[in-house]
């Protein structure tokens, strides 16, 4: 009970839920990046228009999507949803508490002047709201077309992920919105990565500098992979490659 009611406990839960979501993002980015690899092998365009090739399971991205349909992942979906809800709830609560304590719209509590000077550290709440809004936008494009019909029989099911990628990213303005979202995600992750280690007590000056660098690298890998997927799908959908 103390873990969920005390200030330190809430920060700990926020950090752990954040770590869980980072692992998910790494897996999600990796599987989606398979579609970019398929472009270089010539399988993306072929599988996107040939149902026979698609049914044969050709393409790394198709294999990755098949993995995401396994019973293990089906069990993990509600756990993932819970992780998001916990992270959103405690993130909002901590931000509200900080604003109330400081008497104004003050952002995340940070441990040092250097951290306080970071734009992302000061604007974690705003970044979180932007990311949450785009998650809802993103779910209408993919989850609502694949998992939702499969799990609940709602909507039209699209079983070819290549076709779905093309349909979503064919419009340039959708691509731009997603790139903006990935930028917000990058800023959120660069601060969130090292702060989750600080939350669990790993806050030595030497290691904190290293963790900030590692955080930038991890955030860059995740977000650049997503950007590559979106740009590649736009180029494929418009027959530019």
Identify the meaning behind each predicted range.
Residues 1-241:
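Membrane-embedded alpha-helical bundles that constitute the cytochrome b-like, heme-associated redox core
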């Amino acid at each position: 009970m103390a873990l969920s009611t005390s200030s330190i406990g809430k920060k700990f839960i926020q950090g752990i839920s954040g770590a869980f979501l980072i692992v998910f993002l790494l897996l999600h980015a990796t599987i989606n990046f398979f579609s970019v690899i398929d472009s270089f092998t010539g399988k993306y365009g072929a599988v996107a228009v040939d149902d026979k090739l698609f049914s044969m399971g050709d393409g790394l991205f198709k294999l990755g999507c098949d993995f995401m349909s396994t019973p293990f992942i089906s069990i993990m979906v509600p756990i993932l949803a819970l992780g998001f809800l916990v992270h959103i709830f405690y993130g909002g609560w901590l931000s509200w508490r900080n604003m109330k304590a400081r008497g104004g719209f003050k952002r995340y509590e940070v441990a040092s002047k250097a951290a306080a000077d970071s734009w992302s550290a000061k604007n974690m709440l705003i970044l979180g709201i932007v990311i949450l809004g785009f998650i809802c936008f993103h779910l209408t494009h993919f989850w609502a077309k694949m998992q939702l019909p499969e799990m609940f029989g709602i909507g039209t099911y699209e079983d070819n992920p290549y076709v779905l990628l093309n349909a979503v990213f064919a419009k340039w303005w959708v691509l731009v919105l997603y790139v903006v979202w990935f930028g917000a995600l990058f800023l959120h992750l660069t601060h969130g990565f090292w702060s989750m280690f600080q939350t669990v007590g790993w806050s030595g000056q030497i290691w904190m500098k290293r963790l900030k660098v590692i955080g930038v690298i991890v955030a860059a890998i995740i977000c650049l992979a997503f950007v590559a997927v979106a740009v590649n799908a736009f180029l494929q959908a418009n027959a530019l490659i």
